[in-house]
Amino acid sequence: MEVKVENVGKSQELKVKVKNFIKRSDCKKKLFALILGLVSFELTMNIMLSVMYVESNEALSLCRIQGTPAPRDNKTNTENTKKETTFHTTTTTRDPEVRETKTTKPKTNEGATSPSRNLTTKGDIHQTTRATTEAELEKQSKQTIEPDTSTKKHTPTRPSSESPTTTQATAQLTTPTAPKASIAPKNRQATTKKTETGTTTTSRAKKTNNPTETATTTLKATTETGKGKEGPTQHTIKEQPETTAGETTTPQSRRTTSRPAPTTKTEEEAETTKTRTTKSTQTSTGPPGPTRSTPSKTATENNKRTTTIKRPNTANTDSRQQTRTTAEQDRQIQTKAKPTTNGAHAQTTTTPEHNTDTTNSTKESSKEDKTTRDPSSKTPTDQEDASKGTTAANPRKNTEANTRTPPTTTPTRHTTESATSTTGDKTKAKTTRWKSTADRQPIRNSTTAETKTAQSKQPTPKQLSNNTTPENTTPPNNKSSSQTDAAPTEEIEIRSSLWRRRYVYGPCRENVLEHPMNPCFKDNTTWIYSDNGRNLPAGYYDSKTDKIICYGIYRGNSYCYGRIECTCKNGTGLLSYCCNSYNWS
């Protein structure tokens, strides 16, 4: 208690002292001044801090805008670059399946194809190898029948636009000739360079003989095409054309999968051989793209059809086919096609030789096969040339191939397999791709007669493939228009297979001249292109000028029937030629 009392007393004393001190006038003034000073200082500091805060925020925001985004962009660019680099390096093809197939199985077809493609084009050798690897991998994985694995060596090399298709064709060609099939891919590779064209043609015949295998091949080719438009993608296309073209030469693996009766083989082989002969003749011809026009009319139709199947897969497929055909081959095809515009007769003559030479005609076939492969070759000029070459070859097939062709022109790429088996022609397979699987296959079977009747119309299919240069396109267009006019009823019957859906690549603002099949050519009719399920307006029909006005960049299938031509400074030709890089198929 005492302590507390003392403490209380001390505190009271302190309070009293403070009160007394405050009461003094001096102290009051000083305290007042101090308080004012503190308040003013606080206010000024608050103001300064707020100003500084605003300014600092602005500065920070500027720094963030300028500095931060740049690093992010750089990182993104770097990452993208790495990704892109990895993607291109690792994957030649766009489709995942194709990639897997490449890694898993680069085999016989690739080996055989690589040499042949190398023969076709120096630039294509590497591409051919890669494309071959992809195509073969897909074929092997899908078909479950693996061609000889010895061919893998070529696969690691560049994926040539021609090579993938060539590889498949080579393996297939080898198969039709039992000894060839027995021969290891190594032999094929060695032989293919010399006889790549023949082998390719044979393989196409083989593919045709085996509808199931052909379908598988076509799908694979399509997958590859999707991945690398110009390089590996085109490879796939080549495979498809080969598969379609080579009914007789169904590869061993394809034979195992599904092989038509030997009789069909012989017929398809004959057709394939015809194609080869025409192609070889064309090979001698010089101009790659433009020269096609004359052969294109009859032969180009088949080729275009083939191109149609391949291109739909990715424009790349077509390029590969084109690359396959050297300018010379394409020219030869054109040359043959011109004499053989009706082509069926000339082709028929050639057919016996090729059929007989299935084993020995590997070299000849290789040249012609180059032409056949050309449709799937990837070089733009070669692509068109190749399509022409194929068409030229097809003119021989025109009687048989034309029957097959109507399905071929219209077919959806997916349907290419069935079309290929039925037709045994590249054109058939191509047609199938364009058509829906259900429609295309029935059309092929039902349109065999129609196709023959439509042969006169085939100039339109030729135009569809736009693998011909504008020059070449014009003669085919004239034929097709005359044919179309001559047999409108047949065209209407056949159009589902032959005329449905034109395929155009890239922007073309040229006027497109159409030789119509009925429902599409009316005023204000809109032409539609289907691109991966998307419907894009491609143009409209003007009855005053009798032209289809093209809107521009569209890629896909046209829902309208008829072949489309465009008027260019270079003259009348297919849309692709008018645009320099865009094709109808």
From Swiss-Prot:
The chain crosses the membrane at residues 32-54. This is Major surface glycoprotein G. Residues 157-179, 197-225, 248-264, 278-298, 340-362, 400-423, 465-484 have a biased composition (Low complexity). Residues 67-491 are annotated as: Disordered. Keywords: Glycoprotein, Host-virus interaction, Membrane, Transmembrane, Transmembrane helix, Viral attachment to host cell, Virion, Virus entry into host cell. Residues 1-31 are intravirion. GO terms for biological process: symbiont entry into host cell; virion attachment to host cell. Disulfide bonds: none annotated. Homooligomer. Interacts (via N-terminus) with protein M. Interacts with protein F; this interaction occurs on the surface of infected cells. Interacts with protein SH. The lineage of its organism: Viruses, Riboviria, Orthornavirae, Negarnaviricota, Haploviricotina. Attaches the virion to the host cell membrane initiating the infection. Unlike the other paramyxovirus attachment proteins, lacks both neuraminidase and hemagglutinating activities. Residues 72-86, 94-103, 226-241, 265-274, 364-376 have a biased composition (Basic and acidic residues). Residues 110-132, 299-326, 443-464 have a biased composition (Polar residues).
